[in-house]
Amino acid sequence: MKQILKLLSGIALLSIAGCSLGGPPTGSLAAWEKPGADFTEVGKALLECGMPTPYDMDPENQKRSINAKATIYACMIQDGFRDKVGGGTWCENYKSENLPICQPGAVIPRRSVKKRLNSPFCKQHPEQYECYP
């Protein structure tokens, strides 16, 4: 009986903590929403906007500059996605950095299927749904 109680307590704790056992880390995937878009569509959009992989903790993503991150953010907003986390935009939060993407007249890149298919993620994992043409 004690073992069952411990097991149920552990499951409840993991559920409350929001852990997803066996699943990939979500990070940016969970931060974006758009009507009709599932996790796969969010992943595709992130890759098409220039994110190396759809998972924040991947080493390729850690190498990005603040301007690169702000550019991906701007691309996602331009495509109709909403940042669920909030807390201000990259341009607001890094105003003192004078990011190129935040300057008047800066060109915000559009989503690119070519960029997604040539991303480090899709080159390494072509079997993933995000990497289907």
Q: What is each model feature region?
A:
Residues M1-S9:
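Bacterial N-terminal signal peptides that target proteins for export
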